[in-house]
Amino acid sequence: MSSFSFLNQSPDIEQLEAEEHTRETQIELCFQLFQDALERLKDDKFGDANDLFEKLMSQEVIKPDKWGLYAYSSSIVDNLRYLAYRNRGFFYYKFLMNQYSESMSSEDVVDNILKIVENLLESLRHSEADYNVIEVLVQIFESFKSKRLQKLLLENEFMNNDSHLLFSGRKRTNILPQLKVLISQYINLLKDLHASSVLEKKIICNGQAKNTSHLPRTNVKFKNILEQLNKLRTEDDELIKSLDIHDIELDNYDWTSLLRSLRETLPTVKSLALFGRNSDPYAETETPIEAVKVIVKEEVVIDKIHDNSNNENEVTEEKEITDNKVVTTNGNNRKRSITEIETKHAQRSSKRFRDRDSSAADSETPMTFEPMFYSYTKILSLLGCKAPYDYEAIYPDLMEVKANDIIYADFLACLKEWSHWHTDCLSSQNEKEIKTKKVESSTDVSLSHFKTLLNSKNFQKSDDHIPEISQTSLRRFLDKVNRQQCHFHELRFKLIWFLFDNQNGDRLLTSTRWTKQMYRDVEWITLSIEKNIFSFIQSDIAKYRHVALSIFETLINSLVELCEEINSKLSLGQKANDQKTQKVKIEKKITKWNSIIAQVETTDRDWTVRYLWAYYTLIQCTSDIQNCLLSNILEKVHQILMKDNSSTVYLYPNADFISSFDLSFVDTQLKKLKMIKKLVNVDKHSESDKSEDNNSQFIMLENVLLSTISENHAVGGDDDDMIDFFMSAPFMLKFKLWELIYMKYVKKNDIEKTTLIYGIMLKLLVDTLECKTYRTLGPKKRQERLLIMMSCLKDITHNCIEVLKNNAWLQKKLSWYDDTTSQLVFIFFILFPMLPVNTPNKLSGTQTFFQKATKSSKTIKSIFVDILTLLLFHLNIGLKSKISSEPELENSIIDLVSTTHISISFYNFCDYASGNFLQIAENLICQFTNEEAFTQLKQIMWCKYHYQLSGDSSIVSQHKTKAMEMSKMVSLPLGIYLVKLQYQDKHPYINSAKIASKQILDNIVETFGDLSSQDNYIIMRNLHAFNGYLRSNITSKLFQSCFEGKDKVDLKNPNDEFQKAMDAGVFYVSGIQALNLYKIRKRSVQARPSELDAIITMFKNDILYNTKRFESWYLLGKCYSYIVEDDLLWTADKISSSEKKAVIATTQKRAILCYAMSLTLFFENETTRTVDEQIVIVECLESLANELMIAVYKPMEALCFDTNLSSLVVSSSNPATSSEIEKSSVAPIYSITDSSIEDTMIKCLTLANRYQESLLEAGKLDRLNWFNFYSIAIVYSTEKLDRKGDMIDNMSKACELANKYTSVKDSVVEPHVALIHMLYKLYIEGKVTMEDTLSTLKRDKFFEGFDDDFWILDVSLTQDYQKREFFSKLIELLKYVISKDKKKWQHEPYFYIAEILFMEMKDVEKSREWMDNIISIRSVNKNLVNIWKPDYERPGKHFVFTHNYVMFYLELLKYDKDAQSIGLLTKKLRRFSSGMAYIGKANDVATSYFIECVTKKYLLHDKVYTESYMGNINYNDFVKYSQEIVDNSKAADIAEDILEVLKIAYQLKKGTNSVVYDTVCLSLFFQYIYEPYRKEHPETEPQLVSDSENKSNIRKKVSKKDAFDKIRALVDKLP
C-alpha cells in the first residue's frame, strides 16, 4: 500500500467527521427529549418527566467531565444546556409546589430547594438568565439570609447585555417592570449591608432609583416554603452560637484517668516532638473544644494501681491494663469503650519468649525438682556445707519457704506480687542487656566513669511517708471546672496551676505522690502549652514563681532522662541523632525559663533552695564534673540550710531524675566533689602519658579499696580521708567503685585479679542482705534491696564467667576469695525455690511469675544460670581432690549436671546467659569417659549446637534452645574427649563403623580450618618437606628403603595449641569417618571426587603435626587412588589427552609415594605393631601393589615413573607448551625399571599374604584374599617374566579361594576366566600340552559340574581333530563361566570364545556372532562397544579392552571382506572417542581396512578415474548425465551395494574432511554408476575433445568439486 497522503487532509479527518455526525445526532435527540420532558411536566407527570430529564442529562453533549468542564462548546449546544438545566430547575420547583404540605419533612424541603438552586445556577454558566430564574434565586437566597449571594446575583444580572443601557442614560419610563423590581431589591439590599456600589451611583444619577419599590410576585405556597427555610436558618444560627460541650466520663474520681482522658482527646504526639516550635497538639484537632464537662458515673473507692497490698490484678511489664476505665462521649468517639479496654489482650511478646513459656505451661508431665535439690545438698555435705532449708520446706501454693532467714521468703514474695515496680527495681542499676561480644581491648579508662558514678542517685532519701494525691483535691478541681464550663485550653491552664502552684504552703507536685502514668501525662500537657504559659507569666514572674519553678523542675527532669537515653544508646553503639537534636531544643527552653526565674527576689527559703537544687541538677547533666558551679551552688544550698539549722528533707517523689536531699546529703555531695577532685589530680604533674596516668589513678583507687577490707593493703596518710569516706559510704557507692576496678581487669582478661575482686564484690552483696538493717526494713524496702542486689549481681557474674571461658576454665592460677563458694551457695538457695513454685497449675487457673512477666523472668533465669555455672565450677574444684580417693564420686558430678539440666530445661532456659551452663556442663562432662557421661554429653550437644547424634532420638530431648557457633577454644577439648570416649583402646580405622559423633567432629574440624595455612614456622617447614617428598621420583631405592623402615620424611612437632588435639587424632578420626562415608556413597555411585579434597586436608594436617601414624599416610594415598580411579573409570577423554593423562599420573605418583611412606613408618617399628595395625598394613600393601599395577600397565603405561612428568603437567592457561609434551612423550626417561616395579608388586602381595595367614591362624581374619594370588599370577603372565609354574599355581590358588569364600549367588568368575585364557596362551606357545591344560582346569572345583569324560580327549582322532575337540572344550568352559555371571558384566569370555573360533577354528561367522554380543555397529545410538568395568577389573582397563575388541572385530570384517560393516564401524568410531583408548590408532586401521576392502572387492583402479578419466570427459555432457542419474537414480539400475558403499564412503569423507576417501568415492561413482549409464545412452555419447578445442573453450574439464557435488546430491536422495 502506498504511504502517500494529501497535504490538505488530516489523517484523522474521518474520525473528526464521525464525531461531528454523532454530536449532531445527539443534539437532535436532546431537543426531542427536552420537548418530551416539557410535555410531561405540563401534564404534571413528574415521574415520567424526571426520567426524561435524567436521560437528557446523561447525554455526552450535556454532561460535563469529572472536573465539571465541557469538551465541546457552540451556540446551539450552550443554548441546549441552558434550557436543560433551567427547565430541570423549574421542574423541581413545580414538583415542590405540587407536593408541599405542612407534614413534609424539613429534609425533603431543603433537598428540593438545593436541587432548584444547583440546576438554575448551572444554567447561568451557559447563557444569560431570564427574569424568572433571577427572581426565584433571589427569593431563595433571601430565605437563606445570604445577602451577599443576592448582591452578587443582581449585579451579574445588571451587567448582562440586555441591561447595559440602564447605565448609559436610559430613561426610567423605558425600564421593564421586572427590572424595576430587581433595582429596588438591589438598593434595599445595599442599605441593609451598609455598603455602596458603582452601580448604585449610576442608577441614582440616572434617576432610575425613584419609585422602584415594587415587590416581586411570590406564590403563596412558595412563600410558605421560604418562610420555613428562613426559620430553619434561624435555628441553625442559634445552634451555632451555643457552646459545644465536650463530655468526659470517669468511672470514679481518679487523677490518672482524668489526665489520660485529656491527653487522648488530642492527637497522639510523642513527647520528643513537643520540644519543637509548634508544640501544642490542640492546633491539630479537627474541631474546637469550646467547653469541657467531666462526669463521674459513680463514686466508688477502688484499689489504686500501685497499692502496697498484694493485688492479683497488678499489671505485668508485658501488659497494659488500666484499672480505671475512661470513656468519652463526643461525636468523634475518640476513646474506646469500656468493653474494649476490659477485653484488651496482653501486648505481643517475642515469639521466642512466647514459645518457651507456653511449653512449660502446657506440659502434662508432672515435674519435681527434688533430685536437683538433693544432688547439690549431697555434694555440699561432702564439702562441709549445709543447706539452709529442706526441700519439703518449699510450699508452692503458699509461695513461702520455712527457713530461719527471711530473705528466702522475700524473694518468693517478689515473684508472687510482681509488678512494674519490681521490674524497675530489677533494672534500676543496669538498663543495658548483657552482650556476649568480647569486651574492648583498650585498657584506658576515661574519667567520665567517675562522673557517671558520682552523679547517680545513690543517696536518695526515703519518700514512703508522702501521701498519694487525694480524691478530695480532684473533686474540688472538677467542681470548679464544671461550674465555669471552661474551654479546653483554659482547662489545661487551670490544671497546671492547680498541680504546680502553691496551695496552703505546698505544691502538689512535691507534696503528694503520683502514679508514673499521671506524672507522664502532666509532663506531656505541660510541654504542650509551655510556650503559652511562659508568655502569660513572664510579665509577673514573682506572682507565679511556684508555677515557673514546677515547670523548670519538670523540664530538667525531662532533660536528664533524655541524657540518660543518649548515653545508653551511645554505649550500645547505636545512633542518637534525634535525641541529641531534642536535647538542644529542651536546653533552650530551660535557658529561657531560667532567665526569668533567676530574676525573682523572694524571702521564701523553700523556693530558693529548691530552685538552686534544680539548677545544680541541670549543671550536673550539662557540664563537666569539674565545673566550679557545682561546688558553688552546693555551698549556697549548704549555707542556707546551715543558717536555719534545718533538718527538712526536700523530696521529689514524682521526678525520677532529681534527687531528694537534706543537709546531710548536701554534705555528702560536697565530699563527693572533693574526692573527685583528688582522683583527678592524682599524678597531675607527671610527665608520663595519659594511659600511665590513668593506670596510676586506678592503682591508687584499688589500694584504697583493698585497704578498707584488709590491713595488708595499708596506704599513706594522704588517703586517710578517702578511706574514711569509703568506709562510711553506702553500699551502692562502694559497689560502683569496686566495679570500676573490676571491669578494668575484665577487659585485660586477668583471671587472677578478676576472680579475686569478684569474690570481694560478691561478699559485699551478701553482707548487705545478711545484715541486721535488712531485717528491720519493711516488706517493700526489703524486696527493693533484694532486687537491686540481684541487678548488681547480674553483670559482674556474667563478666567473671566470660573471663573464665576465655582462659579455658583455668584453675591453677586462681586466687579465690575465701568465702566465694559459701556465698554462691547462699545466692543459689535464694533463687532455687523459683523452680518448684512456678510449676504451672491448671486447676488454679492463675498465671505463674514465668508466664506473666516473661521479660523480667528471663533476667532472673539468666542470673540463676550464671550462679549455677560458677557454683558447678567451684564444686568441681572441691571434689577433684576427693575423686582420686573415691572414684565413685565421678557419677556425683555427672548426676549434678544431669539433674540441673533436666530442671532448668523444664522452663526452657538451659541456654540462657549466653549458654554458660551448657559450656561449664560440657567442660565437666568431658572429664569422664564412661557411658553415663556420653549420654549427658549428647543432650548438651543438642542444646548447645543442635547436633542430633545418630540413633539417639529416644535419649536426647529436643529442648527449645538457640544453636550456638562452635569456637576453637571449646572444640579442642571436646574433640579430644570424643575421640578418647568413642574409641578408647580400639583402632579407629578397624573399629570405625560407629559414626555417631561424625557431625560433631566434622564441625570441630571445620572450626579449626586448614591448619597447613597457619603462619607457623614449623608448619611451613613440615609443609615444604611434605610437598618435596610428593614431588620426588619413584625409584627402586625408595621401595627398598620403605620395606626396611628407612628414609622417612623429616617432620617436627609444632607443639602449638592444636598439637594435643592432633596427637589425640581429631583430624585423623574425622578423616576416617569421612572416608568411610565416601566409600558408602561410592558403592552407590553417588560420590564425587571433590568430596575427597576435605578428607585429603584432614590427613595432610595430621601428617604435618608429626603424629607418626602410618595409617594417615596410607589413607592419604587411598584418597589419591580414588581420584585416579574416578579419572580412569568414566571416560577415556582424560587418557586420550597428554595433559590430562599427565595430571592423572601425578596424582597416581602421590598415591604410590604415600603408600611407600606408610610402609616406611610401619616397618620402622614392625616388632611393636598390634594386630589391628597389621590388618591396616595388609590393606596398604595390597593398595600399593594394585596402584603399581594400574600405573605400569595400559592405559597409564608407567607414565608416573617418567622423570619429566612435571613438565608434562600443563595448565589450561598455558597451552603453548603442548608441543613440548609431544616432544617429551617420544622418549620418556623412567626412574625405575619394569622388572623392579614387578618385583615390588610381587613382594607387596607376598607380604600381604604372609600377614593374612598369620592373622588367620590367630583368629583375627576369617579368610584370605584371592585377589592377591590373582594379581601375582597376572604379574607372572607378562612376557618379561617366564615363571609358568608360579603363574599357574597362584591362579589356581586364586580359583580355590574364590570358590571357598564366595557364595553361589555372588560367585567370582575372574580367576577362572583368567586360568582358562592363561592355559590357552601357554598351549599356543607350546609350553603346556592339551592334557596338562584339561587336567589343571579339572582341579578347579568351579567346573566340577562337568563329568569325567569331558576332561578326556579322544586319542583315536587325528591330531587336528584332537585340537579342534580341545578348543571346543575350552569354549564350553567359557560358556559355563558366562552362565555363572549373575550381573552379566563379564565381557572377556565372549572375546576369548570369538578369538578361539577365529584364530584356531577359522569359523569367522560364529566368531562374529560372539563379538556381536559386545559390539554393535548398526545401532542408532553412538555406543559401539557395550561393556562395563566388572568389580575386580583395574580402572581404565575396560577402555583398553574396548580398543582390543574393536581391532579384533576389524580383523574379522577384513577377513570377511565386509566393506559396508567396516565403513559403519569407522563412522561410529568418530563418535566413540570417549569410550575407548588409543582411538587414533583404531581410526587409522579402520580407514585403511575400509579402503583396502572396497578396492579389492570392487576392483577399483587407483587414480584412473580421479585423473585421466575426469580430464577427458566433456563438462556439459557430465552435467547432463550426472543430473539424469540423480533425478532417476532408481531407473539407472545401480546396484544397491554400490550405492550403500558410496554413501558410507562419502559420509566418512564429509565427517573427516579428508582426501583419503576421494579415490574410493570417485572410482565407485564413475566406474559403477556414471560410465555404465553413459554407455546405455549412446545417442548422447559425449565427444572427446582435442587439446586445441580444450584451449579454445573456457570450461571443458570436470573438477573434483563438480563430481562430489553430484555424488552428494545422489547420496542425499538415498534412504
Swiss-Prot record:
Keyword S-adenosyl-L-methionine: no
One BP term from GO: negative regulation of chromatin organization
Localization per Swiss-Prot or TrEMBL: Nucleus
Segments for region (Disordered): 339-364
Keyword Nucleus in record: yes
Superkingdom of the organism of origin: Eukaryota
Molecular functions per Gene Ontology: DNA binding; nucleosome binding; transcription corepressor activity
Keywords associated with the record: Chromosome partition, Nucleus, Transcription, Transcription regulation
GO cellular component, as recorded: HIR complex; nucleus
Function: Has a role in a nucleosome assembly pathway that is required for the integrity of heterochromatin and proper chromosome segregation.
Record-stated family: Belongs to the HIR3 family.
Protein name (record): Histone transcription regulator 3 homolog
Gene assigned in the entry: HIR3
